[in-house]
Amino acid sequence: MRHFFKLGLVSAAVLGSQMTLANDFWSQDRQWLLGDWGGERQQLEKQGYKFTASIMSQAATNLDGGYNDSNTLENAGQLTLGANFDLSKIAGWEDTTAAIMITKRDGNSLTLERIKDPRSTTLGNTQEIYGRGKIWRLTQAWVKKGFNDNTVQFKIGRMGMSDDFNSSQCEFQNLLLCGGQLGKSIGSIWYNWPVGLWGTNVKYQFAPEWTLGLGVYEVNPDNVKTQSNSDGFNLDMNNVKGATIPVELAWKPKLAMFNGLPGEYKVGALYSTADANDVGTVSKVHDSKHSFWINTQQQLTQHNDNAKRGLFVSFNGVVNDKATTMVESTQQLALWYKGPFDSRPNDSIGFGLANYVVNKRVRDRQIATNESRGYYEYDDLASNYVPIQHDELNVELNYTYQWSPAVMLRPNIQYIHQPAGVKEVDDAWVAGLSMRLNF
């Protein structure tokens, strides 16, 4: 709660100060709450320097159900500070860009506090912005160079893996409905935002609609430590356990069956050389693990002559290595309509469903562990009872109120079936509110 009120006070102070500084503060065309710095900001962008600063807040309250139905409100937040550099303008390096991004997360998760059995391994989360510690992190520090009219692009530095592979839209507050799926099921080797890690990748656009990507990223547990802020700026590779190698094929057609509207279809696979524990057999270790994925997004309709308005759909799926991964697969289906009203062309309405499928080998091991301790049915009180995990379904309905490019509000209703995959935990209803402020 205190983080929620802190964010509210800061936001109110900023908003109030801007009302006195700019007559056009309430304009729906306003790009940044701190304004254009008297024209300097756009001038810097023309020279190759683009600066970003934003606050994202995600509040959630339990309406009914869950492991603990005592009502509470939890808020998670993130501060992002970044800069992008067009080095062709700054230094004359043709087709070269660079970026640096620092993030700070804070707050608490309603899922951990109320929704799931605290003895069970977490699957989903009602606030996608929560996780990876309440510390400062160097999230990005990379350089990208284009060759052959940018049909070949080479990138190296510190980055998140889903920046370039298994990426997807994020029109929702629920974790599994936001962005790529791999980090939600194999987080021990696939590090998503806000974690940065050493890596490199190359993308080759071998035809106008087709691109092939290949990457190599370190598997380093030090990158996900959360004890202190220094953990978020760890740059050494002393504890590297191996490498994760993703490959992805992307197709961006404008199909006649969708009236020539744009779509994107991606298939990918990864191979990790790091040792991985077997999920069903104690002390058994594998020398690798693998996963496969599909990402699809398609615009289905267009509103009159405005290409940005209309109905969009996405489907994302992941299949993981059964020998080494607790979550066998995930599926996500989402629909959103941009510009539902002529008076609100930048708003959207979204509805999505996402599912975790827990590996049967994990479930068998949980059952065997409980039976060895004398438990043959769910025990709500025993601290050494291991909840048996099945599937978890997440559903969200939301409305995105885009007042301006600088201010976004997203009220939402979420439904969680079998929180953390535990059948004995009541299905939960949650009300949420996301807010983003761009400064």
Curated annotation (Swiss-Prot):
What GO biological process terms does the UniProt entry carry, in alphabetical order? carbohydrate transport; monoatomic ion transport
- Localization terms from the record: Cell outer membrane
What GO terms are given for molecular function? porin activity
The lineage's top-level taxon is Bacteria
Membrane topology is: Multi-pass membrane protein
Its keywords, alphabetically, are: Cell outer membrane, Ion transport, Membrane, Porin, Signal, Transmembrane, Transmembrane beta strand, Transport
The stretch of residues making up the signal peptide is 1-22
The entry's cellular-component GO terms read:
cell outer membrane; pore complex
Report the function annotation for this chain.
Answer: Could be involved in the transport of quinate or shikimate.
Family according to the record:
Belongs to the OprB family.
Q: What is this protein called?
A: Putative porin QuiX
Source organism of this protein record: Acinetobacter baylyi (strain ATCC 33305 / BD413 / ADP1)
Q: What is the lineage of its organism?
A: Bacteria, Pseudomonadati, Pseudomonadota, Gammaproteobacteria, Moraxellales
| Gene that encodes the chain | quiX
